[in-house]
């Protein structure tokens, strides 16, 4: 319902103090993030089993909003999270193509950006782009879940233990290799390479807020200098900071598709799997 209201421009909220929140003119392009394929929708069953929550999310959003979106020059756009393999991407391509054919829409009307946030998927980016070639916009560095996937996948290997969370930053070799490989793979195929989430929240305390903004600037500078075409933020209060960094580096360019990372040595499996150095403390485990 909220997504429908956002598409129609009627979404609003009034808090207990009477303050009203509503959309400004020309809002950002709306992209629907469906649930991961592993999560069921228990309220809808098929042959006695719950259907995938992601399919439920896609069907509801697409069916109720595609006409309004197309009428205003936009379209049904999606983020696909938690992908493990190219076979998942191929399945989504079949779903999208079926929906387009069912409603007499041109191929490619439905577009998607896929998050590379699992350790298996980082080794299959070429295959994923190919599988979704009729619908793909780009790939995104879903780095926090990628770090979790690294920990979960390699949990039985003592030599792959990561240090405390604050030490696992995107400038560390294994994460920087992940970022550069995503850029190189996407741009080779003409797809956009989106940077990861800045998971910081602005603070009302000026000193604390300056620390947050400086961290965001450093993080986004690394992404933009690597060759990412855009990025994610967790709070609209960080939009101006992130945008200023990308505008400074991109200048008049709308993207960095020409950045092919040709100067890089081949990125190896060992680089993607090598943990970074740092302290592992009992305090951070609690």
Give names to the regions the model predicted.
Residues 1-286:
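Conserved alpha/beta-domain cores
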């Amino acid at each position: 319902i909220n997504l429908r209201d956002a598409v129609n421009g009627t979404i609003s909220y009034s808090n207990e103090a009477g303050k009203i929140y509503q959309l400004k003119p020309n809002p950002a392009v709306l992209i629907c993030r469906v649930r991961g394929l592993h999560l069921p929708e228990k309220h809808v069953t098929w042959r006695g089993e719950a259907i995938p929550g992601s399919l439920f999310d896609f069907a509801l959003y697409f069916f109720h909003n595609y006409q309004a979106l197309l009428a205003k020059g936009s379209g049904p756009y999606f983020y696909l999270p938690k992908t493990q393999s190219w076979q998942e991407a191929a399945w989504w391509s079949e779903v999208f193509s079926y929906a387009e054919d069912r409603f007499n829409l041109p191929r490619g009307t439905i577009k998607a950006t896929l998050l590379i946030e699992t350790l298996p998927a980082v080794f299959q980016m070429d295959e994923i782009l190919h599988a979704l070639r009729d619908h793909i916009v780009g790939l995104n560095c879903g780095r926090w879940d990628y770090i979790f996937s690294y920990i979960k996948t390699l949990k039985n290997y003592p030599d792959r233990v990561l240090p405390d969370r604050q030490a696992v930053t995107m400038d560390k070799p294994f994460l920087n290799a992940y970022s550069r490989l995503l850029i190189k793979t996407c741009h080779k195929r003409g797809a956009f390479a989106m940077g990861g989430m800045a998971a910081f929240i602005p603070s009302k305390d000026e000193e604390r807020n300056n620390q947050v903004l400086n961290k965001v600037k450093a993080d986004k500078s690394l992404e933009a200098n690597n060759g990412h075409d855009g990025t994610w933020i967790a709070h609209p209060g960080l939009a101006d900071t992130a945008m200023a960094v990308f505008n400074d580096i991109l200048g008049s360019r709308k993207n960095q598709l020409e950045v092919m990372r040709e100067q890089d040595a081949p990125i190896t499996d060992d680089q993607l799997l090598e943990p970074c150095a740092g302290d592992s403390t009992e305090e951070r485990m609690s």
